[in-house]
């Protein structure tokens, strides 16, 4: 019998690069930040930066709400990825963040203080193999 993860949460983050940030700088930083997440967040299932015309799309896949909240904690002030996230914000501005999956009220409440444009989309049907 197949076992699927029905709790996966996916963030699709639409961003612009900040003025003075070249395509090469985006590429180099994206590799650095992706490696940083891979090394520090075992319950982050996937992470990737993608070119989309003049925008950058970041797709973040989390095992569940707990993993998504842990990531948000990790990038917060005084936490393990605070300095790396500060560099992130030197490169990118957020346009919007679409969150796919059945996000808990806890996750929704946790991200509110970030003051970013979050849009939550519950699933009708889905599966994730991990």
What are the roles of these predicted feature ranges?
Residues 79-87:
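A short, acidic, amphipathic alpha-helical segment used as a generic capping/interface helix at domain edges
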Residues 59-60, 84:
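A short gly/proline-enriched turn/hairpin at secondary-structure junctions
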Residues 1-56, 63-73, 90-130:
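Short S/T/G/P-rich N-terminal loop/turn motif that feeds into the first structured element of a domain
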């Amino acid at each position: 019998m197949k076992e699927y993860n029905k709790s996966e949460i996916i963030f699709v983050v639409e961003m612009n690069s900040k003025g003075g940030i070249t395509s090469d700088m985006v590429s180099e930083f994206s590799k650095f930040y992706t490696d940083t997440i891979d090394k520090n967040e075992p319950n982050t299932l996937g992470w990737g930066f993608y070119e989309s015309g003049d925008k950058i799309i970041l797709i973040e896949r989390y095992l569940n709400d707990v993993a998504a909240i842990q990531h948000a904690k990790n990038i917060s002030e005084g936490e393990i990825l605070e300095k790396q996230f500060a560099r992130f914000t030197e490169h990118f501005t957020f346009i919007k963040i679409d969150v796919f999956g059945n996000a808990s009220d806890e996750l929704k409440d946790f991200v509110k203080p970030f003051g970013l444009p979050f849009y939550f989309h519950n699933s009708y049907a889905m599966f994730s193999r991990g």
